[in-house]
Each structure stands twice: as structure tokens, then as C-alpha cells.
């Protein structure tokens, strides 16, 4: 009898620990569950002319962020995105910034003026933005290591605040 109880307890513990997924982590205010399945792949050049493909980020959490230099909330939150990037290594959280439909000179001038070291992809024709359909700018999608979109944040955030940092720490420590 004692052996059966031990076996049952072990089975329950294993089942409970296996069932904890990123979707079970409750997001802070302003971030919503957005479980829409596999993230749509894309290829874009960054501001240095280097190619980027979303599918190559599999195996890590991705912070996919759509922005524009003319967007007031985008401008305000940019320094907090730099602090977020400084908090997490590229292996923990891949921050992917996509500028929507602006030219390279505009992007360079803007990023230099606000003194951040963030790289950005250039969606100069707006086609990737059309596919992803952010409901406003800025919009952030959080994509799990399996390549599935799990969360969305519309509008600017103070990403350096502990509630967002702690939420993202929970995500990156959970590989589901």
C-alpha cells in the first residue's frame, strides 16, 4: 500500500511540473495573452545591412517590437527598451525591433538622437507590418522558443519596471 501511495505521489508531482507552461504565467497589466499559434516567418535587413530571419531565433524567447520614429509613445519608450536589452542577454531574450515603413536615414538619425544602442530591422515597404498587423504603434509580440506567439502589448510601456522585468524573467526561465 505504501509503495502505491509513493508511486501515485511521484506521478502527480511529475504531471504537475510538466503542465506549467508559459501560457500559465499571468502577464502584468498592459500585456495580454495572445495565443495565435506559430509566428509568421519573415526576412528583413537590419540597419547595418545584415539579413535577419525570424525562424532562426527558435529555441529562445523573442520580443518582437514594431515602432516608428514619428510615433510619440515609441519615442518615449525607446530608452526603456535599451534598459530591457541591458538586463537580458541576447541568448535569454532576443529583442527584435522592426521599424515600419521608414527609410534608413530616418531610422539612423532617430536612434542616434535618442542615444540608444538598439539595432532595428527595416520594413521599408511595410509588407512585414501588413502580415503581422499590429493594432497600433508601438506593438510588441512575445514569441516562445517553439516559435509560437503567446503575448501581445499594444502601446508604450516602461519596460524597465520590475513588474515587466520579473514577468520576462519568468518567461525566459520557462522554455515552453
How should these model regions be labeled?
Residues 1-8:
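Bacterial N-terminal signal peptides that target proteins for export
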Residues 109-117, 123-169:
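Thiol/disulfide oxidoreductase modules built on the thioredoxin-like
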Residues 8-17:
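Bacterial N-terminal signal peptides
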Residues 92-104, 116-125:
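Thiol-based oxidoreductase modules, predominantly thioredoxin-like and allied folds used
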Residues 34-36, 41-62:
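A short beta-strand-turn-helix
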Residues 66-83:
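Conserved redox-active cysteine motifs that mediate thiol-disulfide chemistry
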Residues 19-41:
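N-proximal helix/coil linker or "cap" segments that precede and/or mark the start of modular domains
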Residues 60-62, 66-70, 136:
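Short pre-active-site segment immediately N-terminal to redox-active cysteine/selenocysteine motifs
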